[in-house]
């Protein structure tokens, strides 16, 4: 973590602590604790293995918003053979990258047709570039909406590699577990469905090192874009999932 990034993280940490102090003081005085905002529109940024798959469902459930994981949404559109899915499949079959316009269109489709998005959303996996961030802002502006927070999960690459090489996934739902840090209740079996878990073929050191290098090169400018807007918050994702969650929640509650 560079000096400037560490400074920004410490500022964000102070903000989180102030929110916790306010909540404790209110409780001590017998006043009601701060409650979540009625609308939450947040972006969760973090490299593979940082804990997005663990934390995003908690945000969804706590704040009654939808979890928009762009990879899952794209696969769903392709499987359902929607107009956007058909167009995306043609591009992917030709070896191309799905355009920013299609990805923003898929997000827009969810916001318009997914009832669980009525209170807002947590966006996971998008945007990855400044043009994508700008197109997302434009689409939301047309809906008279805007992003209200961007949270980056900060963690050392070596710790990430150890996390990911032990990761287990439920293919149908995308639920993720870890052999050591977040094991399923029954070994190699999904807690909800009882179906078998798998380890992704690309969850190996060589592939992960390349993915992390790409992530860092892409994410830096996007993070700076949101820092300028005053929306960025950094959280130490090396902490236990429960501590990370409390820090996340304090950010969203303080936005009320």
Swiss-Prot record:
It comes from the Eukaryota. Its main location: cytoplasm. GO terms for molecular function: adenylate kinase activity; ATP binding. The keyword Cytoplasm applies. Pfam families: ADK, ADK_lid. Disulfide bonds: none annotated. GO terms for biological process: ADP biosynthetic process; AMP metabolic process; ATP metabolic process. GO terms for cellular component: cytosol; mitochondrial intermembrane space. ATP binds at residues 49-54, 167, 176-177, 239. Monomer. This is Adenylate kinase. It is found in: Cytoplasm, Cytosol; Mitochondrion intermembrane space. Keywords: ATP-binding, Cytoplasm, Kinase, Mitochondrion, Nucleotide-binding, Transferase. It catalyses: AMP + ATP = 2 ADP. Belongs to the adenylate kinase family. AK2 subfamily. Its EC number is 2.7.4.3. Residues 166-203 are annotated as: LID. It is an enzyme of class 2 (transferase). Residues 69-98 are annotated as: NMP. HAMAP family: Adenylate_kinase_Adk, Adenylate_kinase_AK2. Catalyzes the reversible transfer of the terminal phosphate group between ATP and AMP. Plays an important role in cellular energy homeostasis and in adenine nucleotide metabolism. Adenylate kinase activity is critical for regulation of the phosphate utilization and the AMP de novo biosynthesis pathways. AMP binds at residues 70, 75, 96-98, 125-128, 132, 200, 211. Consists of three domains, a large central CORE domain and two small peripheral domains, NMPbind and LID, which undergo movements during catalysis. The LID domain closes over the site of phosphoryl transfer upon ATP binding. Assembling and dissambling the active center during each catalytic cycle provides an effective means to prevent ATP hydrolysis. The keyword Metal-binding does not apply.
